[in-house]
Every structure is written in structure tokens, then in C-alpha cells.
Amino acid sequence: MVLVLAAGTSGAAQADCKFTATREGSADLAGVTKVVVAAGPGELSIVGSADARRIVARGNACASSQELLDRLNLEVRREGDTVFIDAGLARAINMITIGTVYAHINVGIALPTNLPVEARDSSGPVSVSGVAALKLDDSSGDIEVRDVGSVEIKDSSGDILVDGVRGDATVTFDGSGDIEIRDVGGNAEVGSDGSGNIRFSGVLGNVLVGNDGSGDIVVENAGGDFTVGNDGSGTINHRGVAGKVTLPER
């Protein structure tokens, strides 16, 4: 069975949500050491709270038909010490992104602050706050991360904001979109960036940009070294760097 789906979650799909439903799931905390999230099209919000007594996921499903709505799932299950949260269309469906047919689910997840999170998201905005550690693989959509222990992001497109990291903040790969990383207690790194501006501020450790295709790079107030490996185009500006500054020759 092949279903034709809208490529994104904006436009007609958002304004004309013909069929809607709520989804919910939860899991006990005892013995849990990690949460793994897989989300399809739609908004994804993950919030850590010191008051959380369970892991709770709630979703608002939206589709152009009842058949598609019935296939939009939100599953919370536990395997050993890991809780898995899966949101989106049933795996048995093949999807072609064309036309006006649409299906997506906006998901909010609440969990304790001491749990690390691994998340994979296909499209739509992502916001994460208050978790012990975050590893995020995102295809498209803006990303906002605040008040986390550490963060590692791989992103194809969309802007990235990271604000408030107690440890290290790393963007391993970013295809396009601006990146802003600020208030970091450890090191801050962008491994490879295709296009878009990059800004660092308030980093206690080292700042590293491995490879930058295009866009400006700005560093303000870094406690360690500032290093750029390769830079295709765009300006590089820095002030308040306590350590060594190493930039590519032009």
C-alpha cells in the first residue's frame, strides 16, 4: 500500500486539519537509565522536570482522512532499562511526499531531569530543555536546546539554537541554517557546516569549527582556544578569547 503525503507540516496541513485525535502513553521510572525517541513529521517538545514521577508522552494527531489518522501512532514501551517512544505513521506504510494528503503528529514528552535522551526526528521544529544529556539526529526544521547537561546534534537543515549547557556542546554536522551556541560550561564544536552563520558566546572551554562551507563565524568570550580548520567563504570575527586563536590562511 502506497500513501501520498504532504512533504511538511505547515501550510494547508496545519490550517486544514480535517481529522484530529489525541494520543498518550507513559512509563514507570524505576530502573530507567535512558529514553530513546523516534518522531515522524510534526513538532517535538521534550521537557525535563525535577518533579516528574513518570515518563509521559502526549500527542495531537492531524490527518486528511480517518484512515491516515487511525495509522498515526504514539507508542511508549520499555525494554530493559530503556524507554522507547515512537511517534508517527505505522511502519507498514510506504510514503510518497507529493500532493495535498497529509498526516502528522505533534508530540510533547515530560521526563525527569536526570535522564539522557537520544532522539531522531524527520521534520518539524524540535525543542528540548532540562535533560541530563541530548543526542539528536534531525532531518529538517529548527532546533532549540536549553539547559541541558551536554548536547550532540546532527542536522540536515534548519536553524539551531543551543543555550545553557553544563558540559560540552557539539554539532557534528549541519547542512544549512544558522547556528548559535551560548553559555557553555565545557567545549563547543561545529564539526562540519555547509552554509549559514555560526555564533559562539560565553564558552568556558575551547571553541572549534572543523569545516565551514559558507557563512560568517563569530566568537565572543571563550575561556580556551579558538580554532577554525577550513573555511570556504564568509568573515571570521572574535573577541574575548582567552587562549590561542588558530585560523586558516586565505
Q: At which residue positions do the language-model features occur?
A:
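Intrinsically disordered, low-complexity segments enriched in Gly and acidic/Ser/Thr residues
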Residues: F200-V203, L208-V209
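Conserved positions within tandem-repeat grammars
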Residues: D163, R182, S201, I217-E220, ...
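Hydrophilic extracytoplasmic domains
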Residues: V218-R250
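Calcium-binding motifs, dominated by EF-hand helix-loop-helix domains
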Residues: V171, V190, V209-N211, V228-N230
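Bacterial N-terminal signal peptides
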Residues: M1-G8
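Periodic glycine anchor positions in long extracellular repeat architectures
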Residues: G124, G141, G158, G175-G177, ...
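Acidic (Asp/Glu) and glycine-rich low-complexity loops/linkers
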Residues: G11-D121, P125-D138, E144-K154, L161-F173, ...
